[in-house]
């Protein structure tokens, strides 16, 4: 069975996309519909990293999208950057029931660990054990010292994806540690969130995704180079290359 392929952007509500990707003068309240109108079937909720959204907002986004739509959700920075994975149960008890309001549209949950914080395997073990086993999870390990066989072994044990990423001229390894792959593309230049991927660069990713199709259950790719509306245009081009 071929893998389910989901390609989208990290967020949809960017005022600077109005006139660049969305129709001119698109109000923020209409941007989700404008995003959907371009044929996207997934998005990564990035604002959940900074603050917990209102339940009413999650309900509204859930109800505005089709039954086939998938929301990937970025985990709260309280868990990853403030607590640094320590004592995760109280934070998860607040976070998980809230995002579960998305129902069957809830896709992978991404936890991004901070740069300049090296491995703490005991904390990682405790955090992984605390995660409910009813969801898919991915870890974006921004500090390269986490890119080790010991960390990958732990992710593999729990069927958690090692998030492949490109940011500010740095590229993570490509490691498959779960029955799905998760990719975040923050831009091809030395400045994060800027620049547009070339067709040649996107073809490289398309070839890799095609290779994964036969061995994985799903592949999720999210573009975060929101500057000048590059992210959604790059996402649509990658979808075209995979068609």
What residue spans do the PLM features occupy?
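Residues lining hydrophobic/aromatic ligand-binding pockets adjacent to catalytic sites
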Residues: 1-243
